[in-house]
Amino acid sequence: MRTPVSTYRLQIRKGFTLFDAAKTVPYLHSLGVDWVYLSPVLTAEQGSDHGYDVTDPSAVDPERGGPEGLAAVSKAARAAGMGVLIDIVPNHVGVATPAQNPWWWSLLKEGRQSRYAEAFDVDWDLAGGRIRLPVLGSDDDLDQLEIRDGELRYYDHRFPLAEGTYAEGDAPRDVHARQHYELIGWRRADNELNYRRFFAVNTLAGVRVEIPAVFDEAHQEVVRWFREDLADGLRIDHPDGLADPEGYLKRLREVTGGAYLLIEKILEPGEQLPASFECEGTTGYDALADVDRVLVDPRGQEPLDRLDASLRGGEPADYQDMIRGTKRRITDGILHSEILRLARLVPGDANVSIDAGADALAEIIAAFPVYRTYLPEGAEVLKEACELAARRRPELDQAIQALQPLLLDTDLELARRFQQTSGMVMAKGVEDTAFFRYNRLGTLTEVGADPTEFAVEPDEFHARLARRQAELPLSMTTLSTHDTKRSEDTRARISVISEVAGDWEKALNRLRDLAPLPDGPLSALLWQAIAGAWPASRERLQYYALKAAREAGNSTNWTDPAPAFEEKLKAAVDAVFDNPAVQAEVEALVELLEPYGASNSLAAKLVQLTMPGVPDVYQGTEFWDRSLTDPDNRRPFSFDDRRAALEQLDAGDLPASFTDERTKLLVTSRALRLRRDRPELFTGYRPVLASGPAAGHLLAFDRGTAAAPGALTLATRLPYGLEQSGGWRDTAVELNTAMKDELTGAGFGPGAVKIADIFRSFPVALLVPQTGGES
């Protein structure tokens, strides 16, 4: 198996095709990248910016460059000695435009007789054997249907007609009644849908890749990539949606000839990948959470908790109660169709009614501490969730006791489907709701993180990295992705608030006075986001504010927006640009946070790039990138600027200040090059401790062994507190051999070396043992 040393994620779309990606390969190679990492490239919904709505898995998307474009990327990568990692989406396909998806079109036209009927997860027993499509403004809109060009039309929506169901002059409403599908009002999707989706997205229909024939057809193009040596590895999107993730990975490993595989699996604290999973690890959110938290000041927790409580009227937020509520909001709302389907699968001899079963199943899911179980290994997790659900709702105890053995029986469809459903609820209830409500420090509410873990001390951080080296050395590490709520540099700046909680509280109170918003917790989220991403355009901040408010769902929401509140929200954001006093407050806050945020950014980047695992660089983040949630994190950027800056660095033109964005490029390029060119320096993991008054502000580790020292990473943590306490002073680190800083070229040691000398230019350093000819 070929494995990567590092990757660089590129978002492939119509505006940046595979041919464009091929042209970036020389720059990526110069940057030090080992593998090119591509977003989904199979044919997707026309105009899709992300590619996760695949409509035809049999071909590379023509809009994205087609098979010729993929061949161009692969050829360029091979010429540079690089590999290719590609993102694939086995869980679902895009069905927004049925005519673009031949599988879905066939299903709608032929129903159960379609060759693709088994490919989709349809409950045919509901709705009289028809597929319910929630596309109408209301059920009354059936009168708006038309027959045109041999198709059923609803405004711009087109649907096929089954053979023999239409004769000239037939009323469209009557023709509709004869189809294998039923068009319904969009609001009915919450309770009456009968096909599995990706989360609550009606236009993404679940696919049953657990069926061998479906797997084969869905992966024929993917298999070609490996047969023709176009790709080296795969990133698997949303494996938790699959009926049998373990079986899927085993089959995928076989058909790709033993390729490198990563899964987009979010691990909760303490959770481990099942040993039976044939993959190299995750896409790195677990690493992101660890890196963020070691740069957060634990002393900020108490004052930020107090502030959060005051914003809630004096009562502190109980996170477990909160997520129980937000998950029930999802099970009883946008995913209730899925819960009802589970309830219909409960055997009659269990003596549990549909209503009681749905309530009990939802309560068990709300008690889940992880996204899903993988039975039989996860049996204890399921049992504990059942116990917690019964304690919370004693009146459901009998139903829960009846359900537990059924949910543990892997031969039952109920158990398999329950496992597919719990992850959806976790994602929507926690990531997409609670993370917009629990706002004491925005850094903590990131994908894959547990926001109740406020900070991680260095000794615990080192223990986690040592485990990573021992157990998952080929798992990905990351700081920014297309899914992160805030980019790495936005979070790094927000993290400084943990060191200046008092100043933050005063600034927030002034901003709330100047631009009132009747939702205290949301105001904290909003002003932290603005401070973290500043400078930003009015349009970006308005979009983020509205999305955050609707996701939180307290003062407004997506299905029933609150115009009065949203107008106040808009006014608060406008005030940043139109009210000099508000703008002055924001700029003063940013001025306070920025230098320490830049230090945090460099520390996080160097640590992530050199820690155990396979580091990924998300496109463009070798420069400062202060993005917010999608689609803000997919904005266009210039490779030309980065290429020119890298050439300047290589010519010896180093940044004069560590706040210069070229410093981040310097750190990124030197770390990536070293990992690629000197792999022998990254074979182990040993914590390195400093001595002296500021030892706690140094995070350092040696990637070698006791017998053979390797690359030595040194990074500043809690830089504001360091400055306030008088700086590094006599704090020193012991070097066993002479070493050179890859960032500056300066030499140090052997012996005790002051940290202030090592960090004379930048708040981070990457030291390597000097060879005999170096001085």
From Swiss-Prot:
Signal peptide start and end residues: none
Enzyme class: isomerase
InterPro entries membership: Glyco_hydro_13_cat_dom, Glycoside_hydrolase_SF, Maltooligo_trehalose_synth_4, Trehalose_TreY
Keywords (A to Z) from UniProt: Isomerase
Pfam families: Alpha-amylase (PF00128)
E.C. number(s) listed in UniProt: 5.4.99.15
Reactions catalysed, as given in the entry: 4-[(1->4)-alpha-D-glucosyl](n-1)-D-glucose = 1-[(1->4)-alpha-D-glucosyl](n-1)-alpha-D-glucose
Any one biological process term the GO annotation gives: alpha-glucan catabolic process
Gene Ontology terms, MF aspect: (1,4)-alpha-D-glucan 1-alpha-D-glucosylmutase activity
Family, as annotated: Belongs to the glycosyl hydrolase 13 family.
Protein function: Catalyzes the conversion of maltooligosaccharide into the non-reducing saccharide, maltooligosyl trehalose (alpha-maltooligosyl alpha-D-glucoside) by intramolecular transglycosylation.
Subunit: Monomer.
Alphabetized NCBIfam families for the sequence: trehalose_TreY
Name under which the protein is recorded: Maltooligosyl trehalose synthase
Organism of provenance: Arthrobacter sp. (strain Q36)
